[in-house]
């Protein structure tokens, strides 16, 4: 399918945040692929072509209960795929991948991310989204909840790591057992992945050895959280009070005004300082401004690098040390407004909103091209309506913010700027995510 690029120029707006977020002068985007089914992570191969994962729409096979145990079951099929985008044409070059989804094709677990190593070998992460106890028992042998190594020429693949089974056997965060790996990064001979269901960051060698958790992320304690009105439609009824019911009873040890919510890590990138940076989607009730970016040091200790975001789905560094963060929605998801944002954070802490709404809706992942453009999977939760956008005009630099700028420089900015002054420019690299 050849697409005629539809280019839309958008004046981005200033988004208020404690860091003094600024707006870029203008950003434009073109649609380079559409008609995707639950589009996820995307990545450039060494030959310059762009690849995107499609989680599919499940199928008519066996089913498993949702993570909450309430609501419609998730049913299995082989509708997952990897799609190649080359010279304006899209081609599904890997098909028949496992997929798990609700009856209407939403809420899909399936191919969620793709990466290429230095030799051009691809790896694909397959999501799941339920209790791994039911995976093999209900569905038989599938590659849901695993990292695989595909062969595009033969439309086949081999399993590299079983992340779902690791959660079942180890449960690093000590909470409810669940697995939904969403994104990963290649770091030498290691694959480093986030499991949104297990709330942890894991690593495994490319030869399948030494699968282990690096860190489990803590729950967040919300004070006076805002909940959806009773009766709000939801695929997870346990999250929404029934008619006439109020959320009154906190978990043990919390005051009535407090509520414990899951961290839900969603994406991972390796920073210029060698640490891993992890985006947080947040759990129900998806507090606005409640999402963080964690920094995970070499010793496995995590700290909050930046906060004040809403429902982050991905993040990525460019070759200049700028960090790009992707918001799935600027408001709590239960409000029904899925306008998202792409936010750029400079090494000095400055935040610039490159694009907010205006066609950017429930985006799921991003990557940076060798051309300096940002590529985003858009409408990633809508089967058949998913897109890949190319966002341009992203280089305007606003004045730095104060408080967060000092924090960011203290964290890694000075080291990065010093490195830039005393080394040759890095060659362009392209990495991706969810």
Segments the model singles out, each with a brief description of its role:
Residues 61-78, 133-143, 196-197, 285-290, ...:
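Short, solvent-exposed loop/turn segments at conserved positions within beta-propeller repeat blades
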Residues 35-46, 78-79, 100-122, 166-191, ...:
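Beta-rich, blade/repeat-based domains predominating
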Residues 397, 401-420:
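A cross-kingdom C-terminal cell-surface attachment/processing module
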Residues 28-33, 91-94, 100-104, 158-160, ...:
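A short beta-strand motif characteristic of beta-propeller blades
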Residues 85-89, 151-155, 205-209, 296-300, ...:
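Short loop/turn segments that connect beta-strands within beta-propeller blades
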Residues 78-83, 145-148, 200-202, 292-294, ...:
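A short loop-to-beta-strand structural motif that recurs across blades of beta-propeller domains
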Residues 414-434:
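C-terminal membrane-anchoring or membrane-association module
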Residues 51-54, 123-126, 193, 277-279, ...:
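Residue position within the beta-strands of beta-propeller blades
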